[in-house]
Structure formats: C-alpha cells, structure tokens
C-alpha cells in the first residue's frame, strides 16, 4: 500500500480546500516546495490535483506540473478538469504516471478504453467520487447513480485503477468510513486508491487491512494532525 501526499494546485499555489469549495482554500505556498518536503520525509508517490482545471481552466498550471514531474522523479497521479481526450493526451505527455478521469468517464465511459488502448490501462485511473452512495460529478454538484455500479463499468471499459473519494467527509479530518470502501473492493478486481477523511494511523491501518492499494493524505497532513512518518509507519 502506498501513501500519496496531496499537492492541490490553485492559481499556481499549493492549497487545501474543505469539501471542494474554492472559497475555503488555505495557501501552503509553492507546490514544488511542498512536493519536495514530502519526498524528503519519505514519500515515494504524489497525488497532484490541478484545481484550476477542475474549476474550468483545463491547461492551467501545465508548465508548473511538468516541472514538478521532472524535478521530483517520483510516481505522480494527476487529476482535475480532464474533460476530453485532448486534455487527457496533453497531460499524459507531460510524463505523469497516470491521469484521473472523473466527470468525463461518466459522460463517455468509452473514453477509458480509448485511452487505455493507446497508453495502457495502468496510466488510466477512473475517479469514483461518492456522495450518499451515489457517484458525484461536475465538481460534486450532481449525482448520477450507484457508485459501485459505475466502478464496475469503469473497470469493464478499461480503467486500470480507481480513485475512490468519499465526498461526504473529504477535507473534514473526521476519519475514514470503511464500509463503502470494502463494498467497492468486493465489486472490482483493479487497484483502489482512497481519498477523503484519511486522518490517523488507525485510518491507514484499516484501509491497509481492507486491501486498498493506496491512500491520499491531504488536509490532515497539511494541518499537522498526522505526520508522513506516522502514516508510513502505520502501513508497514
């Protein structure tokens, strides 16, 4: 199991949001400095979200993210505003290890297969953002049916992995809800990475025992509620 420190980028800065709300942003400085700090503390992978992309500017921060990939040299998964095959291709060609396809995957699931056949399924991750058991899309503003049903469909279409985010608890640092995670893992055979609510060693141990492939650490890491050292120790 891997721990992915989050590097969420908005306006060229590393930020953390609460519940995905732009107005809740707390600024943590230069994204590359944040990324470098996590690597120095033992991270071997990063979860990079282009929030400007999620808020409508698809190629915002491209040069910065390319630099981050080049300078860090570690595994990077990237999401945020990938709304077309052209967007996906542009980001894959920056050298990120995999891209996270969210709303686009629910609108055009066949895109997952198209991209997987071109770049390999391992580089295509489908985002399963769930609210009240439903998949949440369009910046979590709309829901479109049972999240497990969508997850199995994404796997059938060619996604090589899934990013499960529990929108109900994301950014609140209140702990993970394991039941939906376990339900999802039972339904699919591809790796599942979990985001949302991960805020203690116990959360990470629970996820590890449930069989997840990775966990994203965001708000709890930046606020100091958990250290990266504690997180890495919890999954040994």
Swiss-Prot record:
Catalysed reactions listed for this entry: 1-(5-phospho-beta-D-ribosyl)-5-[(5-phospho-beta-D-ribosylamino)methylideneamino]imidazole-4-carboxamide = 5-[(5-phospho-1-deoxy-D-ribulos-1-ylimino)methylamino]-1-(5-phospho-beta-D-ribosyl)imidazole-4-carboxamide
SUPFAM superfamilies, per the entry: Ribulose-phoshate binding barrel (SSF51366)
Keywords tagged on the record: Amino-acid biosynthesis, Cytoplasm, Histidine biosynthesis, Isomerase
Cellular compartments annotated: Cytoplasm
Pathway the protein contributes to: Amino-acid biosynthesis; L-histidine biosynthesis; L-histidine from 5-phospho-alpha-D-ribose 1-diphosphate: step 4/9
Residue numbers annotated as active site: 8, 129
InterPro entries xrefs: Aldolase_TIM (IPR013785), His_biosynth (IPR006062), Isoase_HisA-like (IPR044524), Isoase_HisA-like_bact (IPR023016), RibuloseP-bd_barrel (IPR011060)
Keyword Amino-acid biosynthesis listed: yes
UniProt-listed GO biological process terms: L-histidine biosynthetic process; L-tryptophan biosynthetic process
Annotated Gene Ontology cellular component terms: cytoplasm
GO molecular function terms attached to this record: 1-(5-phosphoribosyl)-5-[(5-phosphoribosylamino)methylideneamino]imidazole-4-carboxamide isomerase activity
Domain of life (superkingdom): Archaea
Record's signal peptide: none
Known EC number: 5.3.1.16
Ranges annotated as spanning the membrane: none
Family the entry assigns: Belongs to the HisA/HisF family.
Protein name listed in UniProt: 1-(5-phosphoribosyl)-5-[(5-phosphoribosylamino)methylideneamino] imidazole-4-carboxamide isomerase
Organism: Methanosphaerula palustris (strain ATCC BAA-1556 / DSM 19958 / E1-9c)
Lineage, broadest ranks: Archaea, Methanobacteriati, Methanobacteriota, Stenosarchaea group, Methanomicrobia
């Amino acid at each position: 199991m891997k721990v992915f420190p989050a590097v969420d980028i908005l306006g060229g800065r590393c930020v953390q949001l609460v519940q995905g709300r732009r107005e809740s942003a707390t600024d943590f400085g230069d994204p590359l400095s944040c990324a470098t700090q996590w690597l120095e503390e033992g991270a071997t992978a990063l979860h990079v979200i282009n929030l400007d992309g999620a808020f409508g500017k698809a190629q915002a921060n491209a040069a910065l993210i390319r630099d981050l990939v080049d300078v860090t040299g570690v595994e990077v998964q990237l999401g945020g505003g990938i709304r077309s095959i052209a967007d996906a291709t542009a980001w894959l060609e920056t050298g990120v290890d995999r891209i996270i396809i969210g709303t686009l995957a629910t609108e055009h699931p066949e895109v997952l297969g198209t991209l997987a056949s071109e770049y390999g399924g391992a580089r295509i991750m489908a985002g399963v953002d769930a609210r009240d058991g439903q998949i949440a899309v369009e910046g979590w503003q709309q829901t479109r049916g049972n999240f497990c049903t969508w997850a199995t469909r994404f796997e059938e279409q060619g996604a090589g992995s899934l990013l499960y985010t529990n929108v109900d608890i994301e950014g609140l640092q209140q702990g993970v809800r394991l039941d939906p995670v376990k339900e999802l893992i039972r339904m699919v055979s591809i790796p599942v990475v979990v985001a949302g609510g991960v805020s203690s060693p116990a959360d990470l141990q629970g996820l590890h025992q449930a069989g997840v492939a990775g966990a994203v650490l965001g708000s709890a890491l930046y606020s100091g509620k958990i250290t990266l050292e504690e997180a890495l120790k919890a999954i040994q």
